[in-house]
Amino acid sequence: MDLGLSGKKAIVCAASKGLGRAVALALAREGVDLVINARSQDALKATAGQISGKTGVNVIPIAADITTEEGRQAVLAACPNPNILINNAGGPPPGDFRQVTRQDWIRAADANMLTPIFLIRAVVDGMVERGFGRIINITTSGVKAPGVYPQLGISIGVRSGLTGFVGVLSRQVARRNVTINGLLPGRFDTDRLRENLVFAAKAAGHSSEQEAILARGAIPAGRFGQPEEFGAFAAFLCSTHAGFLTGQNIVLDGGAYPGLL
């Protein structure tokens, strides 16, 4: 299927590895030129070279802290008029909220709620004027099923704030073929998953290998998701075929979410 994205431009945050990298690669395979961002310059440059080598598209790596105004301006200067924005950021570390300081909460809100909102604010009006835009916020399936991740209360809390904001804005720009959706990953085979498994294993008093077995057993698909699967779905959500889908929070978790809605 031709996704109708060839020649378009995208900003992809936290794209040096994991789900962000998978989304960037999937978009590049559809002919999308990229500006990718992460903090680590070496890893980001390596990813840019790999994606460009595989797909032939233009990939500009901008190593910067996207949670700062300077970092956001650097990314936007490299791609001032994106057709696609992929908001993505690593969540705060797992833990008991009783041990979390006020500054920890502020950092989490800045990274996982305010930064995506500021990036959306910077690009959405241009998308409206051009009559095409796709914005995806990569959050967590915990937004819909918080009880599954008791150690991620901070992450779920601030990402839920972003989700509420998008629920309002997405309806305001839909008439101009600008969609804003949340992709809510469950357990995908990434570094972040492995960190969470180690934390959960320590809390439960068993090995991370045993924790991984238990985690897979809670997924009807019987396995962890692969980043490539996530990237392919995100690319479709950015496509010209997905213009009637907006304001939604779509869970990709192998069937683990127990609800109907």
Predicted regions and their residues:
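Substrate-binding pocket helix/loop in short-chain dehydrogenase/reductase
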Residues: 96-97, 104-109, 215-216
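Short, small/polar-rich loop/turn modules that mediate ligand/substrate recognition or access, typified
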Residues: 174, 179, 245-247
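A short, exposed helix-loop element centered on a Lys and neighboring polar residues
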Residues: 120-121, 167
